[in-house]
C-alpha cells in the first residue's frame, strides 16, 4: 500500500505534536518531515518523549525541505504570521497544504486560490477540524430559519492570537445564508464601554473570551418569544481534532483545487 507522505509545519506546538503522534499511528501515512522555528535541530521522536525517529526538525519552512522529503501533504499548525508563507512554499514545491492555522483573511485566501490555479496543486483550509463543531454549525443554520435573533460566544485559551475565531465567522456565514436581514436589539442601544456588545458581523454579535484552562468552545444562542435555544460545542482536548485532520489529509491528497471547510469531506 502506498502511504501518504506527510510533512508537519509547526510540529513543536501543542497541536503540531498531537498531529505528529496521530500520523505515526496511521497505517496509510508516513511522517517524512517536520519544521518548527523553536525546536530546530531536535529529533521529532525526542520532542515527543519517544525513541529517536531519525527525522530532524528543520527551522522555518522552506521549499527545499518539502522537496527533499518528497512530501505529498504539508499540514500547517503554526501562527497567523507564517501560514500564508508556508502555503506558498507547499504549492511551489508541488505539495498540497492542509491549513489548520487560523487568521487567513480574504486577501490571503484569494492569493492561495490564484496559486492553486497556477500550479494545479490542490489546497485545503479548515476553520475547524472538529466534526462536532461542523455539526454545531449545521444545526445553527437550521435553527436560524426559525430563530433569526442570534448571538455567538466563542471561548478559547489565552494564547490564541486572533479574534473572533474562524469557527465563529464561519458560523455567521452559514447562518446568513438562510437568515433574512435583521436589526437586533433596541434601535437606541449604546455601549457605555466600547466593545461591550462584541463584534458585529452581518448583524450578528460575536463575543470572544480568552482565558487559561479553555481549549475551544462555542455557544450559538437563539432567542424567541418565550423561549431560548443554545447550541454548544466543546473541544475537551486536542484529540478532538485528530479524526477530522486525518480525514482531511486522506481527502486532500486527491485534490487539484482549493477546498475550504471540513464539511466538504463529510458525507
UniProtKB/Swiss-Prot annotation:
Residues binding NADP(+), per UniProt: 38
Give one GO biological process term: diaminopimelate biosynthetic process
Q: Which family does it belong to?
A: Belongs to the DapB family.
Which EC numbers characterise this protein's activity in its record?
1.17.1.8
Q: Binding residues for (S)-2,3,4,5-tetrahydrodipicolinate, per the UniProt record?
A: 157, 166-167
Q: What is the lineage of its organism?
A: Bacteria, Bacillati, Bacillota, Clostridia, Eubacteriales
Q: Name one GO molecular function term.
A: oxidoreductase activity, acting on CH or CH2 groups, NAD or NADP as acceptor
**Keyword check for Endoplasmic reticulum:** no
Query: What GO cellular component is one of the record's annotations?
Result: cytosol
- One Pfam assignment: DapB_C
Q: In which pathway does it act?
A: Amino-acid biosynthesis; L-lysine biosynthesis via DAP pathway; (S)-tetrahydrodipicolinate from L-aspartate: step 4/4
Protein name as annotated: 4-hydroxy-tetrahydrodipicolinate reductase
Q: Does the keyword Oxidoreductase apply?
A: yes
UniProt cross-references to Gene3D superfamilies, sorted A to Z = Dihydrodipicolinate Reductase, domain 2, NAD(P)-binding Rossmann-like Domain
Alphabetized, the UniProt keywords read: Amino-acid biosynthesis, Cytoplasm, Diaminopimelate biosynthesis, Lysine biosynthesis, NAD, NADP, Oxidoreductase
Catalyzed reaction equations: (S)-2,3,4,5-tetrahydrodipicolinate + NAD(+) + H2O = (2S,4S)-4-hydroxy-2,3,4,5-tetrahydrodipicolinate + NADH + H(+); (S)-2,3,4,5-tetrahydrodipicolinate + NADP(+) + H2O = (2S,4S)-4-hydroxy-2,3,4,5-tetrahydrodipicolinate + NADPH + H(+)
Q: Where in the cell is it found?
A: Cytoplasm
